[in-house]
């Protein structure tokens, strides 16, 4: 039986323009960094994708190395797309990235034209697609000229393998240089993907200003600080949690008494607002208009429902914003 997409899927979602481009992204996007590799039950991953699309999440964010093993998330997404969403391809924004190690030898990572072109070809094959909507360079390459890396992105757009290009993890000055090169080539950068949350505010120093000046949108990854900005750690470290398992994404030493106190105070404010801490944390990242979308991960449908439900209460009073600043000092 074919998947019957919800006819009301666009009802509760907000779509925000990506910088000065014509592209709009949902305020909440789904990242396939975790929970979509071969270690995950395929039926659960399929259910998450369906749930997301039914709630108006049209943007699915991948990378060549997402798994495990590397490539598995793209393969599984391709299977789900072919089984359920092929009829709605024109309603989807599919993004992928390349920059981290993908195969052995001198051509399997970083930012050479050789690597980026081969990587996207492989990603398209894994997903069964003719093109991706957004293709990112995943991290700056210290050894390859920025002109070569940006020329590779431009080439992939001209070849019809990507509609738009973006950058991830680039610091402000390096991003500015890349934007200028891409503009000269005629393929402007439309989006930047930084790590940004209440507990990771580095982009506020210079990056968000740079994006605004160049008309580039942004999509924040890890907006919940690896799960710390949820109710998961309010009373310590659960045995089945990411921190307890020794995950490199959330180490026990990150859960200091001072940081946990901040999280508890933020949770109290969220409850005053009538929402969960995770919802308030996502809404805070989306405050104003400098962040286009928040990139969530999910292992359960309820997490997607909560994230989309945040949109019904995403605005803050000046007093609430001041309270948050006081807590985060």
Each model region followed by its residue ranges:
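Acidic-and-aromatic substrate-binding clefts and catalytic sites of carbohydrate-active enzymes
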Residues: 36-41, 65-73, 141-145, 172-173, ...
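Hydrophobic faces of well-ordered beta-strands that scaffold small-molecule active sites
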Residues: 26-30, 60-62, 92-96, 135-137, ...
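Short, acidic/polar
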Residues: 39-52, 111-127, 175-179
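Beta/alpha (TIM)-barrel catalytic core signal, keyed to glycine-rich beta->alpha loops juxtaposed to Asp/Glu
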Residues: 2-12, 142-329
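N-terminal small/glycine-rich loop or linker at the start of catalytic domains
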Residues: 19-37, 95-108, 131, 136
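N-terminal binding-site loop/beta-alpha segment at the start of enzyme catalytic domains
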Residues: 1-92
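Active-site groove signature of glycoside hydrolases
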Residues: 124-144
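Alpha-helix N-cap and loop-to-helix initiation/capping positions
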Residues: 40-44, 72, 76, 107-118, ...
């Amino acid at each position: 039986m074919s998947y019957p997409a919800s006819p009301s899927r666009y009802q509760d979602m907000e779509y925000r323009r990506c910088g000065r481009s014509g592209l709009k992204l949902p305020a909440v996007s789904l990242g396939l960094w975790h929970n979509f590799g071969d270690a995950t039950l395929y039926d659960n991953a399929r259910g998450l994708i369906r749930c997301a699309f039914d709630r108006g999440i049209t943007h699915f964010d991948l990378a060549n190395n997402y798994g495990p093993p590397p490539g598995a998330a793209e393969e599984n997404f391709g299977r789900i797309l072919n089984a359920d969403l092929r009829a709605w391809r024109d309603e989807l924004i599919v993004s992928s990235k390349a920059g981290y190690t993908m195969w052995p030898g001198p051509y399997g990572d970083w930012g050479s034209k050789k690597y980026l072109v081969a990587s996207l070809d492989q990603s398209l094959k894994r997903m069964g697609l003719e093109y991706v909507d957004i293709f990112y360079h995943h991290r700056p390459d210290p050894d390859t000229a920025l002109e070569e890396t940006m020329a590779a992105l431009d080439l992939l757009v001209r070849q019809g393998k990507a509609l738009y290009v973006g950058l991830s993890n680039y610091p402000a000055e390096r991003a500015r240089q890349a934007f200028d090169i891409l503009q000269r080539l005629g393929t402007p950068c439309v989006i930047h993907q930084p790590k940004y949350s209440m507990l990771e505010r580095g982009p506020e120093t210079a990056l968000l200003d740079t994006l605004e000046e160049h008309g580039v949108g942004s999509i924040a990854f890890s907006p919940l600080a690896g799960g710390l900005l949820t109710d998961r750690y309010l009373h310590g470290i659960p045995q089945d949690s990411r921190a307890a398992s020794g995950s490199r994404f959330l180490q026990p030493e990150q859960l200091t008494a001072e940081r946990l106190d901040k999280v508890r105070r933020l949770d109290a404010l969220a409850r005053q607002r009538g929402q969960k801490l995770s919802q308030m944390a996502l809404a805070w990242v989306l405050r104003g208009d400098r962040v286009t979308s928040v990139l969530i991960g999910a292992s359960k449908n309820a997490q997607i429902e909560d994230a989309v439900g945040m949109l019904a209460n995403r605005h803050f009073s000046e007093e609430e914003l001041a309270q948050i600043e006081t807590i985060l000092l």
